[in-house]
Amino acid sequence: MPPRLASPERLSRQSGLSYIELMVALVVLAVLASAVIPLARWDEKRRREERLRVHLATMRQAIDEYKKYVDEGLIVQSDVEQMGYPLTLEELVEGVEVGDPNSPDSQTIRFLRKVPEDPFTGEAEWGLRSYQDDWDSNSWGGENVYDVYSLSDIRALDDTYYKDW
């Protein structure tokens, strides 16, 4: 018996069925995509938060290291108001002379390679606190750099503000 060819109306029913299947598949993909996009945004924010934590820890460690050198007498400060802390973050980048400046053994030590960029503001600008400022103050007294914080007003994933980290 010869093979039967599909009739035109049977062909149209088959193609209609595949069109419905295509539409269902597209709807399923759209639903999955709508679930993935917020997760991707959340993941990107989490990565930026991690970079912020690392940058803050790096700068705070550099400030502490500077203070340690002053306390050990390796860095001589002429201004008593500095309380053993650097005047600016740039001082940590440019470096300070350690030891007796007249001695051939003196050397310049840099505590930071560069001031890191705040991942949420996109700038290498940070809020600064001096030793004389209140712990929660957002205005810098300018005497020294005791602490740094983000200038971002955005809320973190844990519902705190980045400037409070």
Cite the ranges covered by each PLM segment:
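Internal alpha-helical transmembrane segments of multi-pass membrane proteins, especially GPCRs
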Residues: 15, 21-24
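Alpha-helical hydrophobic helix detector
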Residues: 23-38
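Residue-level signal for short amphipathic helical patches enriched in basic/charged
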Residues: 14, 32-35, 43, 47
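Membrane-proximal amphipathic alpha-helices
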Residues: 41, 45-56
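Conserved short-loop catalytic and cofactor-binding motifs
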Residues: 40, 47, 76-80
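N-terminal leader/signal peptides at the extreme start of proteins
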Residues: 1-15
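Low-complexity, acidic interaction segments enriched in glycine
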Residues: 61-165
